[in-house]
Amino acid sequence: MSGRLCLDLAGTKLWRRSLRTELLNSPSDMGRWMRQAELLDDPGPMDTRGLERVRRLREAIYVLVRAWPPGDDPSGAGFRDALAEVNDAARLPLPRHQLDVSGRLTRTGGVDEVLGAVARDAVDLLSSAQFGKTKECANPDCTRLFVDVSRSGARRWCGMAECGNKHKAASYRKRKKQQTVMET
């Protein structure tokens, strides 16, 4: 949906300005996200300490993406703490990828390897030209981030099924209501 692994992780907390919805409520939610993100085939047992580490990295990524580029005066200790969190995690090992004789890929590792992969993706994004195409959803309540790779660079929504269709439907209802008022 977002176009980047690090932004997918940042998107596991929704509606940050209003109804704050946590998608990583438990270690099993975290394991499911790791599988869906194709980081690990079998994350194995997860614990609350690992969950907290993943959430901490997620929040650091969100802070950095919203405040980047920092310019001459990084905005306070929160920014510096977030940068340190991402840089520390980027030094961790990556998931191990292996092919078997049939060509099947297996991805193994644990929380450290997932943190390493996500943090490196964040470092890559923040230091690349692609960062200039990073946007926040145009829905005022939605705080999902994405990379706009559309040809025109005019993508506005995190996803049509999520926010785009809701906005279009609301606009349609508003136009119909105004049209009805004008006709009476």
Segments from the language model and where they lie:
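Short, cysteine/histidine-rich loop/knuckle motifs that typically chelate Zn2+
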Residues: 136-141, 160-162
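Short helix-coil boundary/hinge micro-motifs
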Residues: 1-136, 143, 181-184
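Histidine-centered nuclease catalytic patch
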Residues: 143-148, 152
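Residue-level signal for short amphipathic helical patches enriched in basic/charged
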Residues: 129-132, 149, 164
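Cysteine-rich micro-motifs
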Residues: 153-164
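Short acidic, gly/pro-rich beta-turn/loop elements at beta-sheet edges
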Residues: 20, 147, 168
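Basic DNA-binding region of bZIP-type proteins
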Residues: 162-179
